Curated annotation (Swiss-Prot):
This is Polycomb protein SCMH1. It comes from Homo sapiens (Human). Signal peptide: none annotated. Associates with Polycomb group (PcG) multiprotein complexes; the complex class is required to maintain the transcriptionally repressive state of some genes. Belongs to the SCM family. The keyword Signal does not apply. It comes from the Eukaryota.
Length: 660
């Protein structure tokens, strides 16, 4: 039985359920880590953070006002380009992606549009504005014209600062890695100096440690990421656990004094986003110093100059200016994350991750677990994994199989070393072994990977897309057929567990903001669409990838498209409409079209749409997917502009009516 960790009698820490803090999976959890290291989490009142984490209702592309992190006296226009947990990734309009930065949704440094003018200020161009400064007013006008402004209601008041510095050496917390600010990692208070604290990252050498004020917004209580949905990175892979000779309940809460030895090695617990080798430049594992942590001695390395060479004959000697050596330890906090040192797009979550498919799989605890898995351990697993990114859910599912195995080595042998994916671990032969899963590029790969693993485990009925009952069928190979599994980027998808139920979308995974009228929890509204398109249920894999975004809209959209078509029909398109009888596509069921057939249809529908035909090959859109496309999908996923998207929607509607 897992027990949530509580260390202070009078101070209630984050009220985390055991299913969050402690998990039978092999990934990192604070509950187990605190017990094994005999550590004390910093109480919530030490931080300048809300006791209840604020909700994040921002959306990508929303505009707001933000302080320029490189020139804090300037207020600029910023665009939300990324979201994670309670944080926003912002980009100043007129700047490039090398200077993106992160802010909490309750930061005082972000305000709704109009706040600066209301207070008598003026919006300024960002430092490094790429255009001529004289063009700023016109640039500002064009930027705000028609843009989506973040509403005032989704901004939150910044929490008050603690009355003074309550931190003590050895306390555990979660902290932003300022050299890679999209990472939040487990950390320890290494030293306290007045109003400042030294943040040291567990399991990594001191190159990434930094000083900050006790009221910095870059440090969080233990459990913050679990509550906000942010990704907490695991500590380094070779951390030595300090053992406390006294029970955890005997720890002095006023002055933590935890004695330790360095004999026991912590088995690495990969997090839901395992740190990938080489991801952080120059970061190598370090040995965790026994508590209380003494201040690390950071001696300045001597500057190295190129080898001295004699001057050339006739040349003049120029005096060489020596650089000032860096201070041994900074005495002031770093006000902002140093994103200028991060390579382009390295300080942000990759665009592929922003639009990554969302997956949720359920665990069948009542079915046969096969000869390799312990049924009692399977019963202790959570009922489902996700909804989360496909790579995260894949890692959780695979790690669960390893953790529940009678012999972890057997399950581990079924896996091959990949590159760029999440990390899983197993313990056998008195050693810990880690392995990178392959990078997950599509939902299709996730499905085939789990199918193959379950087949090797002889437990083919282990995972599904709905809570399991006695009538649920297993994941079958036919559902993973490569010819049917083509997916658009950024879609929401739930693993299918039977052909009969594959049309049912997962209500948690749907975008209620973008499709408020199209949300359904059963497949009844999808079946008329299937019959009108001529799609039998047995070919529903193409439907699954789009039905979670809603069914085709009503007649108003069709009337709008027909009006648009009459006004914008291109010259020569009528000739194509009349001569299409000779096309090799005529008489064939559109649902049987290949990608090449779809490209031919686009070219024949309108000559002006010809340049866009290659997009259908790029996104692997066959006949089944074509029949489900809407104008908003083509604009969002394929990058088409409104005009071509409406024209294509018009032709697709005619195709459904049998007028092609």
């Amino acid at each position: 039985m897992l027990v949530c960790y509580s260390v202070l009698a009078c101070e209630i820490l984050w009220d985390l359920p055991c299913s969050i803090m402690g998990s039978p999976l092999g990934h990192f959890t604070w509950d187990k880590y605190l017990k094994e290291t005999c550590s004390v989490p910093a109480p919530v009142h030490c931080f300048k953070q809300s006791y209840t984490p604020p909700s994040n209702e921002f959306k990508i592309s929303m505009k707001l006002e933000a302080q320029d992190p490189r020139n804090t006296t300037s207020t600029c226009i910023a665009t939300v380009v990324g979201l994670t947990g309670a944080r926003l990734r912002l980009r100043l309009d007129g700047s490039d992606n090398k200077n993106d930065f992160w802010r909490l949704v309750d930061s005082a440094e972000i305000q709704p549009i109009g706040n600066c003018e209301k207070n008598g200020g003026m919006l300024q161009p960002p430092l490094g504005f790429r255009l001529n400064a004289s063009s700023w007013p016109m640039f500002l006008l064009k930027t705000l014209n028609g843009a989506e402004m973040a509403p005032i209601r989704i901004f939150h008041k910044e929490p008050p600062s603690p009355s003074h510095n309550f931190f003590k050496m050895g306390m555990k917390l979660e902290a932003v890695d300022r050299k890679n600010p999209h990472f939040i990692c487990p950390a320890t208070i290494g030293e306290v100096r007045g109003s400042e604290v030294l943040v040291t990252f567990d399991g990594w050498r001191g190159a990434f440690d930094y000083w900050c004020r006790f009221d910095s917004r870059d440090i969080f209580p233990v459990g913050w990421c679990s509550l906000t949905g942010d990704n907490l990175q695991p500590p380094g892979t070779k951390v030595v656990i300090p053992k406390n000779p006294y029970p955890a309940s005997d720890v002095n809460t006023e002055k933590p004094s935890i004695h330790s030895s360095t004999k026991t090695v912590l088995e690495h617990q990969p997090g839901q986003r395992g740190r990938k080798p080489g991801k952080k430049r120059g970061r190598t594992p370090k040995t965790l110093i026994s508590h209380p942590i003494s201040a690390p001695s950071k001696t300045a390395e001597p500057l190295k100059f190129p080898k001295k060479r004699g001057p050339k004959p006739g040349s003049k000697r120029k005096p060489r200016t020596l650089l000032n050596p860096p201070p041994a330890s900074p005495t002031t906090s770093t006000p902002e994350p140093d994103t200028s040192t991060v390579p382009q797009d390295a300080a942000t979550i990759p665009s592929s991750a922003m639009q990554a498919p969302t997956v949720c799989i359920y665990l069948n605890k009542n079915g046969s677990t096969g000869p390799h898995l312990d049924k009692k351990k399977v019963q202790q697993l959570p009922d489902h994994f996700g909804p989360a990114r496909a790579s995260v859910v894949l890692q959780q599912a695979v790690q669960a199989c390893i953790d529940c195995a009678y012999h972890q080595k057997t399950v581990f042998s079924f896996l091959k070393q990949g590159h760029g994916g999440e990390v899983i671990s197993a313990v056998f032969d008195r050693e810990q072994h880690t392995l990178n899963l392959p990078a997950v590029n599509s939902i299709t790969y996730v499905l085939r990977f789990l199918e193959k693993l379950c087949h090797n485990l002889r437990s083919d009925n282990l995972f599904g897309n709905q809570p399991f009952t006695q009538t649920h069928l297993s994941l079958t190979a036919i559902e993973y057929s490569h010819s049917h599994d083509r997916y658009l980027p950024g879609e929401t998808f739930v693993l299918g567990n039977s052909l009969a139920r594959s049309l049912e979308p997962h209500s948690d995974s749907m975008d209620s903001a973008s499709n408020p009228t199209n949300l359904v929890s059963t497949s009844q509204r999808h079946r008329p669409l299937l019959s009108s398109c001529g799609l039998p249920p047995s070919t529903a894999s193409a439907v699954r990838r789009l039905c979670s975004r809603g069914v085709l809209k009503g007649s108003n959209e069709r009337r709008d498209m027909e009006s648009f078509w009459k006004l914008n029909r291109s010259p020569g398109s009528d000739r194509y409409l009349e001569s299409r009888d000779a096309s090799r596509l005529s008489g064939r069921d559109p649902s049987s079209w290949t990608v090449e057939d779809v490209m031919q249809f686009v070219r024949e529908a309108d000559p002006q749409l010809g340049p866009h035909a290659d997009l259908f090959r790029k996104h692997e859109i066959d006949g089944k997917a074509l029949l489900l496309l809407r104008s908003d999908m083509m604009m969002k996923y394929m990058g088409l502009k409104l005009g071509p998207a409406l024209k294509l929607s018009y032709h697709i509607d005619r195709l459904k009516q049998g007028k092609f």
